[in-house]
């Protein structure tokens, strides 16, 4: 619970968005299965968001002026469907190219220091032309949102540069996040789509920032696959509730298209990569085992159960119990609150059995 609360508090402090930080933990980490953790995370997020708002009263995202286009319902529906389809297609490419770069860059026959030098030179070269485009790129996004360019070609080149730089950064292995770069990419794609609509005479220049905010939602939903978190987050950090309902429509459509395209969430790709690096034989080795450690909570299903009489799914076995700083053999023991139980299972079953086994040891 403290781990989840810390994750939510960090996001809340960064964006001054306590509600979306709690949703992130519930939707992405706990998968709607831990109300006590949700309450803890919400309290931590409210406190962290309150402190952040006290120290930084205003956020730059509030300065974006979002004006809804005056289009008919059906015309807006057509544009949103088209936009969601385009974003889903780009996200599909993104989900394929990022793992490719992450596999390709380490195979280069160069020392780590040489690779980092090349990345440093690339970052410096980009900074000479457009300073705010490096890093997360949020300052560049803010500039475009408040007084953006009308040049589609120039914006397209900037998006391409930011995209390539993000790929190299994510593949370098250096510490850093992907959330802000993804947010910026979505916003710039929304601006580009808006400028194309302006060129076609569909909307006015004053509506481009509106499309930018919707683009943030769409691309984050497509890449991260946490629609509730993203929709609430963009609404919270921008303060533009007029974008809330379009975000629901576009976010829902984008999520549907990503399901059709079978796009794997980026967080899952990162986790799989990290897990493979630490467990290179998993799960290709036939009969490989995985050891899961859970703590028994008071009132849970496993509380008070005798290990010898306990039947676990898919031939899972309790190997040992950690109690009072001592490791005990599981045979003949009765589980009590506070026990840390070691469960052995087939490695191939970890994805489908993890949540059920954790639920048996916890109160949800």
Where do the PLM segments sit?
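Core mid-bundle transmembrane helix pairs that form the ion/substrate translocation pathway
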Residues: 39, 43-46, 55-132, 139, ...
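Hydrophobic alpha-helical transmembrane segments
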Residues: 2-3, 38-43, 77-82, 89, ...
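Alpha-helical transmembrane segments of multi-pass membrane proteins
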Residues: 1-9, 158-163, 199-218, 231
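Transmembrane alpha-helical segments of multi-pass membrane transport proteins and ion-pumping complexes
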Residues: 9-21, 45-58, 85-96, 120, ...
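Cytosolic Rossmann-like ligand/nucleotide-binding regulatory domains
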Residues: 298-349, 353
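Membrane-interfacial segments at transmembrane helix termini in multi-pass membrane proteins
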Residues: 209-213, 217-293
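Short, non-helical or kinked segments that cap or interrupt transmembrane helices
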Residues: 1, 15-39, 172-189, 203-212, ...
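Helix-loop-helix hairpins and the membrane-proximal interhelical loops
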Residues: 97-205
């Amino acid at each position: 619970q403290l781990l989840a609360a810390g994750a939510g508090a960090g996001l809340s402090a960064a964006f001054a968005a306590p509600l979306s930080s709690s949703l992130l933990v519930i939707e992405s980490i706990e998968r709607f299965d831990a109300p006590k953790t949700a309450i803890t995370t919400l309290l931590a997020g409210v406190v962290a968001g309150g402190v952040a708002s006290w120290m930084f009263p205003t956020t730059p995202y509030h300065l974006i002026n979002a004006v809804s286009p005056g289009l008919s319902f059906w015309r807006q529906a057509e544009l949103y469907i088209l936009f969601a389809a385009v974003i889903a297609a780009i996200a599909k490419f993104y989900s394929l190219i990022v793992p490719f770069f992450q596999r390709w860059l380490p195979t280069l026959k160069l020392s780590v220091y040489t690779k980092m030098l090349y990345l440093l030179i690339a970052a410096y070269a980009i900074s000479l032309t457009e300073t705010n485009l490096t890093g997360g790129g949020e300052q560049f996004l803010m500039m475009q949102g408040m007084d953006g360019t009308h040049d589609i070609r120039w914006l397209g080149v900037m998006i391409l540069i930011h995209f390539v730089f993000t790929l190299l950064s994510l593949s370098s292995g250096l510490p850093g996040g992907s959330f802000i770069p993804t947010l910026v990419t979505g916003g710039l794609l929304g601006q580009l789509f808006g400028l194309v609509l302006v060129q076609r005479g569909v909307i006015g220049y004053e509506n481009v920032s509106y499309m930018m905010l919707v683009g943030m939602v769409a691309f984050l939903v497509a890449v991260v696959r946490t629609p509730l978190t993203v929709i609430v987050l963009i609404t919270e950090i921008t303060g533009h509730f007029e974008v809330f309902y379009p975000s629901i429509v576009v976010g829902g459509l984008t999520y549907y298209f990503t399901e059709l395209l079978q796009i794997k969430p980026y967080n899952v790709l990162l986790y799989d990569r990290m897990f493979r690096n630490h467990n290179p034989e998993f799960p290709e080795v036939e009969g490989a085992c995985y050891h899961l450690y859970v703590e028994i909570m008071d009132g849970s299903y496993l509380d008070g159960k005798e290990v010898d009489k306990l039947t676990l799914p898919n031939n899972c076995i309790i190997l040992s119990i950690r109690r009072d700083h001592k490791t005990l053999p599981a045979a003949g023991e009765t589980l009590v609150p506070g026990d840390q139980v070691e469960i052995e299972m087939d490695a191939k079953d970890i994805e489908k059995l993890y949540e059920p086994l954790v639920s048996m040891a916890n109160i949800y």
